[in-house]
Amino acid sequence: MSNPDPVTFQLAGLGLRTYPGEYPVDGITPYRHQWALHDALTAREPGTFVNDAPTGGGKTLSWLAPVISEGLSTVAVYPTNALIEDQKRNISDLLNDVDGGNDCQLLAVTSETLQNKYAEQFPEASSNGKRLSLLLKQAFSSRKTVILLTNPDIFVLLRREIYRERIGEIKRFEVAVVDEFHRATRKERNTMLFLLDEMYDTNESVCRLNHLVFLSATPEVRLEKQFEEAMVAPYYRVEDFGWRNTPHPAISRETPSTISFSPGDLPADYRAVLPPVDLLIEPAPTFGTATKMLDNEEVVLERLATGRTVIMLDGVHEIDRVYDRLCRTDLTRVERIDGFHREGVREKINTFDTLVSNSAVEVGVDFDTDQIVFSGHDAASFFQRLGRLRTRSDRSAAFAYAPPYLFHDLEPLADSLSRQWVNRTEFEKCIKSAYVDSSTPASFDWRYSAVEAYDHVEERVEDAPSDDQLAVRKTGWYRIESHFFNREQEGLSESDLQRIHGVADSELLETLKTYRGESVQTLVYNQRSQTVQTYNLPYLLRHSDISFHTRDDFLTHLPDELIDQVSRLEPYSSGYCIYRGDFQPSEIDSDQAAGRLFTYKATGELYSLLSDHPRDIRTPEVCTGLEVEVTPSVNGVDILKDDLSTDQILCYPLEGHVSQIQNQYSLGSFGFIYPLLYSEGEAAVAFGHDALYLHCRVQDRIQEESSTFDEVLDF
C-alpha cells in the first residue's frame, strides 16, 4: 500500500496590538493582556486571573512588571527545573529595566539547589525543610520584594509542610503565578487548585495571598468550570478586562487587540507573535515518527537543508536513531537535547543548524528557528510544539507527524481550505475535536482527589486549636464538595467521604500527597556526559547500553564531585546503573526501534493482587516484590532484581494484553501500562498515578452497570 500524500494548511500569523502608556518597564510598549494584568495587580484587585495570550506574547512580563513595581512578593511555579533556570536568567536580565527591580530578591528553589547551593549557604541546616525555611526568612527580612521561582513539587511540600518544618513564610506571598497550567495532569491540577483556593480563602492576617495568576492555553470547558464554580476568588480571563469599570484609555479604541495576518500583511501597530506557517502533516504512529522520517530520508534531508530546523520527537530512542543518521549526512552543526543530553544547552541553542530533541525543549528552552519538524501524539503536544515557531513575521514552515486516524480526518478539511490562509483559532478547534480524547476520567476527582483533600483537611484539623477545629473541618468539607463533587449529586455527606477515605490505606495516601506521583526509575551515571540523574527504567532496559551495580561498586565508577548527588537521588530510584549510550542490537535481531524485550513479573504481593482479587473489587495497592525480565540479558540485572524487589510502589494489575487494555479503556499511547508475566495468562500493570487513573476507568465501566451511587463509593 502506497503512502498517502501529505495534507497541507496555510496558517495565518497572529499579531498583537501594542498600546502606549506609562508602563513600568523601559523600552516596552505593552499588549492589551499586559495592561490588563498590570491594572488588576496595581489596583490590588483580588481574584483568579487566567492569561491565555499566545506563546511568545509576553505572559511572563504581564505579571512580573506589576508585582515588582508594586512590591508584591510572588511565588511563581513552573513545571520543569529547566524552565525555572531559563526564567531566572530572563528575569535577571529584565530587572534593571523594571521600576523597583533593584529592590527585588530573586530566588530559584529546586531539590537540587536545596541540596547543593543552599546547603552550602546554610551549613547549620540538616534538612531541605530547614534550608528552605532559613532561606525564606532571610529573604523576607531584607524588606525587598521576594520573587520565588520553584516547581509544583516544592510548592506542594511547602504548603503541606511535608518537610516537617513549619515554613510559615509561604503565607507572606501576595501573588501566586502558575505557568503552563494546561500541561498539568488532572491530579496535578486538582492538587494545585485546592491548595491555592485554601490559601486565598484564609484570613488575610494569616495568609496574604490575594491574586492567583494562571499562564495557560485557553482553558477547556471543564477547567473553566473549576475556575468559575470551585474557586472562592472571582474568576477573570485577562483578555476580557472585566474588572475595570473604565478600561485603560489606550484600549478604549475600536481596533482589535489580536489579528490574523497573511505574509506581508502585518499592520504597523501590531507585533507578530506567531508567523504565517506552511504546515504539512503526514501520518505516523506514536513513537513511530523516527521510522517514518528515516524511511523517507531523501525528502527529510531536502527539507532540513532549507533552513535552521528544530525536530521534536517523543521517545529518546527516536532521537538516538534520527540524530545518529543525520550526523552521517552532509548536514552541518547537528545537535541534540534530551533527558540524557542537557549539557551545554545554551551553546547548542546558539549554534545548531539542526536540533533533534523531545519534550526537553517543548517548554523552558528559548530558540529561534526557521522551521520545525514534530510529532503530535495529542492535541496539547501538537499546539505546544507548533507554537515554538514564534515572534517572527516571516513566512515559516512546519512538518507534523500525526496519528493516522487524525490524518485521515484532516484530508477533507485540507481540501476545503486549500490555498486559504486559515485563522489559527478555527484551525485549533478543528484539530482538537478530531483527536481521540484520552484524558483522565472525571471520576478521579471524587475517587481520589477528594480522598487526598480530605486527608489534608484532617491534618489541618489536628493542628488547629480545639476551638477552631469544627470550623476548619466544615470549611474544608465545603471546599472538597465544591472542587470534586457534581452539585447535581444529592445526598453526599461527610460520612460518605469518610467511607472513601477509609478505603485508602496510609501507603496510598502517601502516594497521593506527592504532586507528580511515582514511577519505576533507576539511578544513572551517564559516562558520556559525566552526570548523575534518575531515569525511566523501562526505557533504559529496552534501548540503552547499560549495566547494573551494587551501590559500593557504582560509587567507584563516579568522579568524586558527583558522589554527593547519589544520596540526594537514591531515595527516588531503584538500583544503580551505568549508561554508555544506545543499545545496538545484533544482526539477528536488528529492530533498533523495538529494542530489547522487557516485561515485569508478577510475584509476591503483586501476584496475589492479581490472582486473589476479582477485577470488579480490585484496587491499587502498594506492593513489594516487583521483578523484571529482559532479553537479551543486561549485565547486572540480577543486582537490579534484588534492589527492585524490596521497593514499595503503587501497582494496579489487569488481565489482558497491553494493547487490548489500551483500546478497551481508551488510554492512548501515553497511558503507560507495561506487560506483566503472569502464570495464568496475559496481564499488564500500571504504576503510581497511572494506576489510579486506570482503576478509575475500570470502575467507571462497573458504575455504568451499578444501580446506586453508594455501590460506587464502596469501589
Regions found by a protein language model. Name each.
Residues 1-715:
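N-terminal helicase ATP-binding lobe
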